[in-house]
Swiss-Prot record:
It is an enzyme of class 2 (transferase). It comes from Prochlorococcus marinus (strain MIT 9211). Its EC number is 2.7.4.6. The gene is ndk. Gene3D superfamilies: Nucleoside diphosphate kinase-like domain. The keyword ATP-binding applies. It is found in: Cytoplasm. GO terms for biological process: CTP biosynthetic process; GTP biosynthetic process; UTP biosynthetic process. This is Nucleoside diphosphate kinase. One of its GO terms (cellular component) is cytoplasm.
Length: 151
């Protein structure tokens, strides 16, 4: 059985501010498994597909401009309950509403510069994983401490 997977992306503000290591470590400490990671500057076409659900909203162009403005760290994480678990680690979309201890609660203050993106459900995760990664880019491996993380 394949464990649940989710797509996460550290946005250009998180990369530029040197937050990549801290953000990665939060997911590792939680016990989720990183199965794919790459750094890229997304093309406009990729960004427009990724944010396609917002195409008719007034902030769409700004969102696409921002996500294509610099490097992004695109990742796939795997584990039991990883989609909901990642959303809880990330915190509210609006950083000022995010709880202390969450990534956005601790590291962001503006909704337009909220450091990280995370898939909001299984269908979205599947779509985003397929959009950002080829299947050949995923690593299937078992951490040596796996028996100590889940029953």
């Amino acid at each position: 059985m394949v464990a649940e997977r989710t797509f996460l992306a550290i946005k250009p503000d998180g990369v530029q501010r040197g937050l990549v290591g801290e953000i990665l470590s939060r997911f590792e400490r939680k016990g989720f498994k990183l199965i794919a990671l790459k750094q890229l500057i997304p093309s406009r076409a990729l960004a427009e597909q990724h944010y396609g659900v917002h195409r008719e909203r007034p902030f769409f162009k700004g969102l696409v401009d921002f996500i294509t403005s610099g490097p992004v760290i695109a990742m796939i994480w795997e584990g039991e309950g990883v989609i909901l678990g990642a959303r809880k680690l990330i915190g509210s979309t609006k950083p000022l509403d995010a709880d202390p201890g969450t990534i956005r609660g601790d590291l962001a203050i503006d909704i337009g510069r909220n450091v990280i993106h995370g898939s909001d459900g299984p269908e979205t995760a599947s779509f985003e994983i397929g959009l950002w990664f080829e299947s050949s880019e995923l690593s299937d491996w078992n951490p040596s401490d796996q028996l100590w993380r889940v029953e």
